Every structure is written in structure tokens, then in C-alpha cells.
UniProtKB/Swiss-Prot annotation:
The active site is at C155 (s-palmitoyl cysteine intermediate). GO terms for molecular function: protein-cysteine S-palmitoyltransferase activity. Residues 347-359 have a biased composition (Polar residues). Residues 125-175 form the DHHC domain. This is Probable palmitoyltransferase ZDHHC11B. It is a multi-pass membrane protein. GO terms for biological process: antiviral innate immune response; protein targeting to membrane. GO terms for cellular component: endoplasmic reticulum; Golgi apparatus; membrane. It holds the Pfam family DHHC. Its EC number is 2.3.1.225. The lineage of its organism: Eukaryota, Metazoa, Chordata, Craniata, Vertebrata. It is an enzyme of class 2 (transferase). Residues 360-371 have a biased composition (Basic and acidic residues).
Amino acid sequence: MDTRSGSQCSVTPEAIRNNEELVLPPRISRVNGWSLPLHYFRVVTWAVFVGLSLATFRIFIPLLPHSWKYIAYVVTGGIFSFHLVVHLIASCIDPADSNVRLMKNYSQPMPLFDRSKHAHVIQNQFCHLCKVTVNKKTKHCISCNKCVSGFDHHCKWINNCVGSRNYWFFFSTVASATAGMLCLIAILLYVLVQYLVNPRVLRTDPRYEDVKNMNTWLLFLPLFPVQVQTLIVVIIRMLVLLLDLLGLVQLGQLLIFHIYLKAKKMTTFEYLINTRKEESSKHQAVRKDPYVQMDKGFLQQGAGALGSSAQGVKAKSSLLIYKCPCHFCTSVNQDGDSKAQEADDAPSTSTLGLQQETTEPMKTDSAESED
């Protein structure tokens, strides 16, 4: 494929440069989260879910007293089960525009986009790549290479686009994961406190009657009891607690961010569009100010330097770089290149969907969403 600039150049929706390597959208459109190749974020998601489930239901809940044990099984089990269901639904749904689902043959490769014929991928609500009429909220996702109705963002954690068809399942996935993390932290803290105060409270299972050594604990109760030393239990508990806290911080940020978006009646895509416009306006204002000069990391006013090189870099970064609160789901190109998008409404450097088209092939430093 020729990726040189020129009006006669035919390219796929977006060609993006990541660490000096040109990355192109898939020629075969993705159907849902199970379309190959699976992103490694998705593999990590399932590995963490399985690992935390085993630790919760086979190691730590069996240590609880009988009165708390069954409550923990019901509450935590219900949350984990609900999370599994909504996660699967969010991944399995095809979020494409209704006309795309009705008329598109997913086994056929996508056509190349000819910039000499069309200024935009979507014009007058018609996609020149999907060859269908789409609704006003539809965007053409560069990661799935198809039009997504009510496009919000492309989530690598579920390996699927998030649009109007699966948004609430995605939101429920995040909310239930956060609730599950909170339940697990409560269980871990209870086990830790009881171990320090009265370890016998954690040894109420009948199988402990045959264990005389107080430094010996049983894991994977009640089906496959395995005897281990206290140090092993402590190491497992600390690793699970660390993983749980890290996950809770990220999921909590993401959940709060999407609650904020719903309160503002915005999508992630629209939020990034507006934010990038504000950042661009601030940057332009600084560049036009004759008393403020930013050059090679120095912030100067007139002839007098106001800070060191490091301070200048920090000040410059604060004006030029924006990081989305949901950075584990989405990322936005930070080089200020307006050639990263294609659409009919407003230009943007967000890499979540295709907005304003230009006459040159799109080359950006950041190419994909990170969920």
C-alpha cells in the first residue's frame, strides 16, 4: 500500500504510526470481542478474573466463620456471577450500526479508501467503506474497521467496541467488577485482622480438627484441601490484596468517569473531542501571546527566564498533553496532529473513531484505544 501523501493515494480508514511502525486497520472487519486476534489485555482480564475467583472462593472465604462464610458466598458469588454474565454479553454483542449488521458480509475484506473520490469516510450519513447509510451518532472505528452505532470508545479489555448496543453491559461490567473488588478487600482485611487477633476464628472448618500445628493452613476447601505453611498464605494474601487494590483504583476511576459522562449526557468520544479542542485553544493562545515564549523546554517572559528547563518542560506538558481518566480503556493522540480522525462534524485527534479526513495519509504516534 502506498502511504505517501497525495490526492490519488488509496488507503484504509486510518494508517497510524506507533513507535515508528506503521499500523493499519484490519482488512476483515471485526464482529465482536471474540474476533481474532484476541488482544493481550483480554487474556489478562480473564486470567485475573479466574485467579481472583479461585483465591476468593477456594482460599479466603473458607477461612471465615460459619455465620460469615455463607453470607460471603451468596453476596460475593452473586456479584462475580453477574459480572461474568454482563462481561460476556458486552463482548459478544456486535455493536455495529443496524444497516451494517443487515447488509455487511464480514467475511469479505474492506475496500481501500480513495481520498481522490471522497473527502470523508462518512459523508451525509453514508459510509464509503461500509457502503451503507448510518445514523447521526455512528462513527467508523479504526480498530474494528466498521461503523459503530452510538460510538463511545474501543475497549481492549473486552476486545470490542463500546456503542449504544452494548454500552450499559459495559457499564455494568465495570460497576460489578468494582463491587467485586470491594467485597474481596473486605474479606482480606477481615482475615488479616482475625489472624493478628485470634487465628482460631479462621480455623472453624471441621477438617482443621486433624491439623494440630497452628502454622499449618488448608487451602482449596472444601473439595481439595491442601496443607501449606503460614508464610505461603501470607504471600498469597499480600499478592491478591495488591492486585485487588491496583484493580480497584483503575476501575474506580473508570466508573466515576462514566458516571460523570452520563450526568453530562456525553460519550467518551465526545468528551475527548471537546477536551482536545480546549487544549488546542489554550495552546494557540499561548503561542500567540508575545510575552510568553516556549522554546526547547524553557518558559520565558520577555527576556527573563521564569524557570529551569525541567520546569519549562513541565509547564509545556501541562498545556500540550491530556490524559483521559479512563486511560486503561482509551487513549488519545498527544502530538496535536489533526490528521488522526475522519468524520463530518468536527476535527479531533482522538484515535477512538474516524473523524475529520484530510488529503494526506494519517500518521500519528498513538494509534489505538487502551481498555
